[in-house]
Each structure stands twice: as C-alpha cells, then as structure tokens.
Amino acid sequence: MTLPANQSPEMVILCNELGEATGTAPKSEIHHSDTPLHLAFSVYIFNGDNKLLVTRRASDKITWPGVLSNSCCGHPQPGEPLTEAIERRVHEELRIRADDIRLVLPEFSYRASMTNGITENELCPVFAAHCKTSGVNPDLNEVSAWEWVHWQWFFESVQAERLLVSPWCRAQVDLLAPLGANPSQWPVAEERRLPKAARTKIDVQLKVS
C-alpha cells in the first residue's frame, strides 16, 4: 500500500528480552517468520451492563484474519504513552471512546505462529476499559463483526474451547479469569511492572542500529 505523501508509516517499538527499547521499525515490514520482539497492548472493553466487546478480525489482516479476539489491540507509537495509544486505537478501529483505562496484566507477553509461518512476538500489557455507549461503528478494514457478551460466558466458552479466539486472547483469558467474575473490580496493577519500553518515552528519531 502506498501512503499519501504527507502520511508517515506506522512504527512499532522494538524491544529486547529485558523489555528495553532497542529501536523502531515500520509495522508493515515486521510481521514474517522471524518477527522481532516489539511493544503492543491488548484492551478488553466493557459497557454499562458489564458486557465485553468481542470483535472478529477483518479477513485481510496479516495476522489471524477472520478470527475472534478481544476488543482491540495495537502498538504505541514512539513517545506515546500506552493509555493515549489505547484511546487513539480504540477510536480509529471501533469509533468509540475508551474511558477508565486500567492496567490489569502488565507483564503479559507471547509468541505465536500461523500455519503459513507468519509470527506475532509481542510484549503486550493488557488493559480493561469502559465504554459509555454500546453503539460501535468499526473500521471494516480492521473489524468485520462485533458483539457485546457476558464476561463469564466468554471466558468459560474460551477455556472450554467452545469458542476459538486469537492465541493472545486465549492466553490472556486464562490469566484474567482468576482476577474475578466482575471485571469492574479487577485489581489495578502497578505501572512499575510494565516493560521498561512502556515506561520510558522513546525518542521518535530512534532507529534500528
């Protein structure tokens, strides 16, 4: 895809195994069989009825197309705090506003490969958020379908493998379920447990050496 002349490519923050930032790279270039470790986030959005927004990834996504997953995922840009990245991405992808953003799994990371070899490899802190409206108008290039469901039904269905979801969502559900049946009461984790790359403002000029 050719970007407009005034639009910069979306970047991701590359990391080492210690969670430190080592550089940046265009998002469009990093997903392959040897995807480098990079910083991301996952967010689980709940409405006023405490229902979870579950989304189906668009069919032309590079990674796990057409698969059910959590509400939203994304990558912070260099110098962008995670909460601001979540607000931005939720609005871009779902056309809703994420409020009351809370860190719940600060140390989550995963590596998973599709049958074609394309791999995800992320330091991916997990957040919960609230949305005051149930009306969603997603970007169809990102999300092909969506539904609000009860959290207990969702995690029980995922754990029983009655509902097949993305590999990161599957692993996250196993860690979120013990936090309690009421997502609004999940304990908030300390930000100091985040990867260092997520706690440090990264110079936007940082390049891969």
Swiss-Prot record:
Which reaction is the catalytic activity of this chain?
Answer: isopentenyl diphosphate = dimethylallyl diphosphate
Q: Which GO terms describe its biological process?
A: dimethylallyl diphosphate biosynthetic process; isoprenoid biosynthetic process
SUPFAM superfamilies, alphabetized: Nudix (SSF55811)
- Please state the gene responsible for encoding this protein: idi
Q: What this chain does, per the record?
A: Catalyzes the 1,3-allylic rearrangement of the homoallylic substrate isopentenyl (IPP) to its highly electrophilic allylic isomer, dimethylallyl diphosphate (DMAPP).
Any one Pfam family here would be NUDIX
Name the enzyme's class: isomerase
The record ties this protein, via InterPro entries, to: Idi_bact, IsopentenylPP_isomerase_typ1, NUDIX_hydrolase-like_dom_sf, NUDIX_hydrolase_dom
Organism this protein belongs to: Rhizobium rhizogenes
Q: What is its EC number?
A: 5.3.3.2
Report the locations given in the UniProt record. Cytoplasm
- Location of the Nudix hydrolase domain: 36-171
Major localization class? cytoplasm
| SS bond partners | none
One of the entry's Gene Ontology molecular-function terms is:
isopentenyl-diphosphate delta-isomerase activity
Q: Which GO terms describe its cellular component?
A: cytoplasm
User: What name does the UniProt record give this protein?
Assistant: Isopentenyl-diphosphate Delta-isomerase
The active site lies at C73, E122
Cofactor(s) this protein cannot do without:
Mg(2+); Mn(2+)
Q: Which family does it belong to?
A: Belongs to the IPP isomerase type 1 family.
Alphabetized UniProt keyword annotations? Cytoplasm, Isomerase, Isoprene biosynthesis, Magnesium, Manganese, Metal-binding, Plasmid
Q: How is the cofactor bound?
A: Binds 1 Mg(2+) ion per subunit. The magnesium ion binds only when substrate is bound. Binds 1 Mn(2+) ion per subunit.
